[in-house]
Amino acid sequence: MEVKLDFSSEDFSNYSYNYSGDIYYGDVAPCVVNFLISESALAFIYVLMFLCNAIGNSLVLRTFLKYRAQAQSFDYLMMGFCLNSLFLAGYLLMRLLRMFEIFMNTELCKLEAFFLNLSIYWSPFILVFISVLRCLLIFCATRLWVKKTLIGQVFLCCSFVLACFGALPHVMVTSYYEPSSCIEEDGVLTEQLRTKLNTFHTWYSFAGPLFITVICYSMSCYKLFKTKLSKRAEVVTIITMTTLLFIVFCIPYYIMESIDTLLRVGVIEETCAKRSAIVYGIQCTYMLLVLYYCMLPLMFAMFGSLFRQRMAAWCKTICHC
C-alpha cells in the first residue's frame, strides 16, 4: 500500500498543522460490522424470552416451594436453576429498558452486568455440583449423609458464591455511556481488558467446570456398568441428556468466544471478513446460550422427582376432568 501525502514546509510553521490536501489510502478502510438482527427484532426476541423464562421458572419454583418438605438434594439444585434463570429474566428486562433509554445510569448498568454474568457463571457450577452429587450417590449409596437435603443446600450455596466471584470483575469495569450503552472499558487498555475477561470467562465458566463434570460423569458411568443397579438405565439417560444439551447449546458460544480471543491477541490474522464472521457467530450462539438458560429449569426439572411427580398428578387430574 502506498500513501501519498502532499506536505510543504508551510504546513508546519509555528508547530501548526494546516494540511488540506488529499490522502489516498487505496483499498484501506475501517471495518464496518453491522448487527445481524435489527433493534426491533431483538426487542421482540427479548420480550419472548422474558415471558417464557418468567412463566416457566415461576411454575417450577412454585412447585418447589409448595412441596419443599418432600424435596431431595437434586431438587434444591433444580431450584438453583430456577433462581439463576430468574436473574437472567431480570437482565432481559433491564436490557429492554436500556434499549428504550429508560432509567439508565452507571449503577443500573452494573446491576444489569451482575444479573447477566451471574446467570452465565451460575449454571455451569450448578451442573458441576449435580455431577458431583450424582457421583457421591453412586459411590456412597449406602451412606446416610449423602442422601440428606443439607448436601443439596450446601452445594447450591457454594455454586452461588463461585458464580458471584466470576461476575464481580465484569461488574467492576462496566460503565454507562450516553445514549444507551453499558460498556466494559478501562480507557486506553480496554482491548487488553476485554481479552483478559474473555480468557477468564472461557476458563472459569467453561473449561474448568467441563473438566470436572466429565471426570465425575466418567467415574459414575464406569461404576454403573461395573455394578447392577436397578436404576442404571435412568441414570445413564440423565447423564447423556445433560451432556448433549450442554454440547448443543453452550459449546458453540464458547468456541466463538475463544476464536475472538485468539483474534484479539494476534494468533489469528484479523481481517474484516473474519471479524464480521466472528461477530455474527457470537450473536447467534449467544442467543442459543440465553435460550438454554431460559429453558434449563423446565428441561432439568423433569429429572427431579419432586417436579416430575407433581406434573404426573396434574396430568391425571386434567385427564379425569
Curated annotation (Swiss-Prot):
Membrane protein topology class: Multi-pass membrane protein
Cellular localisation: Host cell membrane
Database matches in InterPro entries: CCR1-9-like, GPCR_Rhodpsn, GPCR_Rhodpsn_7TM
GO process annotations (BP): calcium-mediated signaling; cell chemotaxis; immune response; positive regulation of cytosolic calcium ion concentration
Keyword set, alphabetical order: G-protein coupled receptor, Glycoprotein, Host cell membrane, Host membrane, Membrane, Receptor, Transducer, Transmembrane, Transmembrane helix
GO-annotated molecular function: C-C chemokine binding; C-C chemokine receptor activity
Topological domains annotated Extracellular: 1-34, 94-124, 167-196, 252-286
Sugar attachment sites: N14, N18, N117
Primary localization class, coarse: host cell
Keyword Electron transport belongs to the record: no
Residues spanning the membrane: 35-51, 77-93, 125-141, 150-166, 197-215, 235-251, 287-303
Cellular component per GO, a single term: membrane
Family: Belongs to the G-protein coupled receptor 1 family.
Purpose of the protein: May be highly relevant to the process of cellular transformation and rapid T-cell proliferation effected by HVS during latent infections of T-cells in susceptible hosts.
Protein name: G-protein coupled receptor homolog ECRF3
GN (gene name): 74
